Amino acid sequence: MLVLGIESSCDETGLALYDTERGLLAHALHSQIAMHREYGGVVPELASRDHIRRALPLLEEVLERSGAARGDIDAIAYTQGPGLAGALLVGASIANSLAMAWNKPTIGIHHLEGHLLSPLLVDEPPPFPFVALLVSGGHTQLMRVTDVGVYETLGETLDDAAGEAFDKTAKLLGLGYPGGPEVSRLAEFGTPGAVVLPRPMLHSGDLDFSFSGLKTAVLTHVKKLGGNVCEQAKADLARGFVDAAVEVLAVKSLAALKKTKLKRLVVAGGVGANRQLREALSSAAQKRGFAVHYPDLSLCTDNGAMIALAGALRMQRWPAQATDDYAFTVKPRWDLGSLGA
């Protein structure tokens, strides 16, 4: 079965073709970072308009790369939510319009389920069950993943997501957009231990997170430094922030493995591309004897490949979830725990 995936939940337009026998055939992605940079964040109206411009050229690109023809496609999967309402509507409209023209079924996919399953796109995918650390700009959760559609929330952020804390720290340090990668890059030049920041809820005894206090600690430190902060002071603060965030994420992930008695950890979402986090978890895996799996770096960000994969896996298990009536809704807010099989 060949599935076309369309992702448009925020500021990336992604299309991909996934075959249930041959795997990922091709994926193409357009990022809107350059367009939103001058505003310091995503402008929803601009994001929606750009999705409209980019989707069909990206479709032609994945068809050319894969060698597939439009008639070879068996179904179309699209991101139904959560995300920006206008951006979701663009992707859903394009998916259902193509499906109507080609007489193909469609299936709406939860954006976070796509991230959860994205490590299955590697050459040696992790078998179920596993613990997943889902860490991105809008979400920070630990999940027990028993199978496709069988997800249990073990812990989640009580306030800000880790990615939000990265972005806020970048703004406080006067860094560019997007902030997360900029903070991580600057932290590479920081002196370990020069700035020690709190590790919120590190010893709370549960698997929940909190990053608002860490953001406040960064703000307090910036105010103490005053104006005209030198680059080394910025780098030291960035290093202190990254060290604190990574330690909390790693310690909670290890606790989730211990609680569930599982030996496999999957890391997904944009913050999962962070080098320091990967090194910390990989080091712990070697010492403690568990396996840790990541998607390819190119698939940590939002992408169509994960949507195509999730659509294919769901249609294999539950063909009735696909529809050919081309009536659709989008869900800007959608709890992953309510998804089910």
Curated annotation (Swiss-Prot):
It is found in: Cytoplasm. Keywords: Acyltransferase, Cytoplasm, Iron, Metal-binding, Transferase, tRNA processing. The keyword tRNA processing applies. Its cofactor is Fe(2+). InterPro entries: ATPase_NBD, Gcp-like_dom, KAE1/TsaD, TsaD. Substrate binds at L134, V135, S136, G137, G138, D167, G180, N274. GO terms for molecular function: iron ion binding; N(6)-L-threonylcarbamoyladenine synthase activity. One of its GO terms (biological process) is tRNA threonylcarbamoyladenosine modification. Its main location: cytoplasm. The keyword Ligase does not apply. One of its GO terms (cellular component) is cytoplasm. It catalyses: L-threonylcarbamoyladenylate + adenosine(37) in tRNA = N(6)-L-threonylcarbamoyladenosine(37) in tRNA + AMP + H(+). SUPFAM superfamilies: Actin-like ATPase domain (SSF53067). Its EC number is 2.3.1.234. Fe cation binds at H111, H115, D302. Binds 1 Fe(2+) ion per subunit. It is an enzyme of class 2 (transferase). It holds the Pfam family TsaD. Required for the formation of a threonylcarbamoyl group on adenosine at position 37 (t(6)A37) in tRNAs that read codons beginning with adenine. Is involved in the transfer of the threonylcarbamoyl moiety of threonylcarbamoyl-AMP (TC-AMP) to the N6 group of A37, together with TsaE and TsaB. TsaD likely plays a direct catalytic role in this reaction. Belongs to the KAE1 / TsaD family. NCBIfam families: gcp_kae1 (TIGR00329), T6A_TsaD_YgjD (TIGR03723). This is tRNA N6-adenosine threonylcarbamoyltransferase. It comes from Paraburkholderia phymatum (strain DSM 17167 / CIP 108236 / LMG 21445 / STM815) (Burkholderia phymatum).
